[in-house]
């Protein structure tokens, strides 16, 4: 009769490999090298077969043992979500199985509306709840940026203000019960927020970097932490661009909360929402029911994907 344990070799002699769980979660990734954690909390260094790179931080995976400290990742388990970006040349997986994206922004240095809108689109496409975090809210330059962010509140995206001296306490209720990821431009204070939320856990990241011989600070790679038994947090590297080439142009209106209710209401089924008569999108922008700038953004992304 076959053994019930997936790693058993049928020999009765105790073997440390047999105690290893056959599933794990990726908590950090450096190229084709990973750190995984099994349900009992044990961590292992992990590699992949055939130089696969289609794994992301947060992935739940099947593993096979190599020795007491190392495993091989065989495949990932079905994903609840996948957040990634893609330009004309390459695809970058950001995180898997997250339920909430926190886009960290601040008035200083210059915030990017382009990056914010693109990240929101990616979250909508992935079925991930999005929250905008206005960091450094005590800066005098904040008022003008906050006024711009209030528009996104009208679209259903909460805007949470944080200040360094508050130790990120205003974020904790928002994070609770979610698998969260912090994402934002470089210089927005994202790492400071993460450190405030994680406390002593950040001291362990140096050991992980050394174990993988990365020679780099771990903020150059996504890293997953447990805030409590119900809440996870992924700290991701800062970025300046968010390619959306993985999206389909025809699906874009569904990812705009301010336009999705108009899908199917144009006179022509193949309306490009530009010069056609009877365009519901144009009518909404002209009457003030929708933002002309948002319509221009939709048109621009459509051109980008079709070009």
From Swiss-Prot:
CDD domains noted in UniProt: YjeQ_EngC
Entry EC no(s): 3.6.1.-
Biased composition (Polar residues): 10-21
Keyword Cytoplasm: yes
Needed co-factor(s): Zn(2+)
Record note on cofactor: Binds 1 zinc ion per subunit.
InterPro entries, alphabetized: G_CP_dom (IPR030378), P-loop_NTPase (IPR027417), Ribosome_biogen_GTPase_RsgA (IPR004881), RsgA_GTPase_dom (IPR010914)
CC annotations in GO: cytoplasm
A Pfam entry, by short name: RsgA_GTPase
Span list, region Disordered: 1-21
Keyword annotations of the record: Cytoplasm, GTP-binding, Hydrolase, Metal-binding, Nucleotide-binding, Ribosome biogenesis, RNA-binding, rRNA-binding, Zinc
Domain (CP-type G) ranges: 85-242
A biological-process GO annotation: ribosomal small subunit biogenesis
Enzyme class, spelled out: hydrolase
Binding site for Zn(2+): 266, 271, 273, 279
GO molecular function: GTP binding; GTPase activity; metal ion binding; rRNA binding
UniProt-annotated location(s): Cytoplasm
PANTHER family registered for this protein in UniProt: SMALL RIBOSOMAL SUBUNIT BIOGENESIS GTPASE RSGA (PTHR32120), SMALL RIBOSOMAL SUBUNIT BIOGENESIS GTPASE RSGA 1, MITOCHONDRIAL-RELATED (PTHR32120:SF11)
Subunit and partners: Monomer. Associates with 30S ribosomal subunit, binds 16S rRNA.
Family statement: Belongs to the TRAFAC class YlqF/YawG GTPase family. RsgA subfamily.
NCBIfam families: ribosome small subunit-dependent GTPase A
Biological role: One of several proteins that assist in the late maturation steps of the functional core of the 30S ribosomal subunit. Helps release RbfA from mature subunits. May play a role in the assembly of ribosomal proteins into the subunit. Circularly permuted GTPase that catalyzes slow GTP hydrolysis, GTPase activity is stimulated by the 30S ribosomal subunit.
Protein name per Swiss-Prot or TrEMBL: Small ribosomal subunit biogenesis GTPase RsgA
Organism of derivation: Neisseria gonorrhoeae (strain ATCC 700825 / FA 1090)
């Amino acid at each position: 009769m076959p053994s019930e344990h997936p790693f058993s070799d049928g020999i009765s002699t105790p073997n440390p490999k047999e105690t290893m769980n056959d599933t794990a979660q990726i908590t950090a990734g450096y190229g084709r090298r990973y750190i995984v954690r099994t349900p009992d909390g044990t961590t292992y260094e992990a590699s992949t077969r055939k130089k696969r790179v289609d794994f992301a931080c947060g992935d739940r995976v099947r593993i096979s043992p190599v020795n007491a400290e190392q495993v091989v990742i065989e495949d990932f388990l079905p994903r609840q979500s996948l957040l990634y970006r893609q330009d004309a040349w390459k695809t970058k997986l950001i995180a898997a199985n997250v339920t909430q994206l926190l886009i960290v922004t601040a008035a200083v240095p210059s915030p990017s509306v382009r990056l914010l809108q693109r990240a929101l689109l990616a979250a909508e496409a992935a079925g991930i709840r999005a929250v905008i975090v206005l960091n450094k809210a005590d800066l005098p330059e904040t008022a003008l940026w906050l006024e711009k962010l209030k528009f996104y509140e009208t679209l259903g995206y909460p805007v949470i203000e944080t200040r360094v001296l508050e130790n990120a306490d205003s974020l904790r209720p928002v994070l609770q019960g979610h698998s969260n990821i912090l994402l934002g431009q470089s210089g927005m204070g994202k790492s400071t927020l993460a450190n405030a939320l994680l406390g002593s856990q950040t001291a362990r990241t140096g050991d992980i970097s050394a174990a993988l011989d990365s020679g780099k600070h771990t903020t150059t790679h996504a890293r997953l932490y447990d805030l409590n038994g119900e809440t996870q947090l992924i700290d991701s590297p800062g970025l300046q661009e968010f390619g959306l080439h993985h999206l389909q142009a025809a699906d874009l209106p569904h990812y705009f909360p301010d336009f999705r209710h108009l899908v199917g209401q144009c006179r022509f089924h193949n309306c490009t929402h530009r010069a056609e008569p009877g365009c519901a999108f144009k009518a909404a922008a002209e009457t003030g029911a929708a933002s002309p700038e948002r319509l221009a953004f939709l048109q621009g992304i459509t051109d980008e994907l079709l070009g």
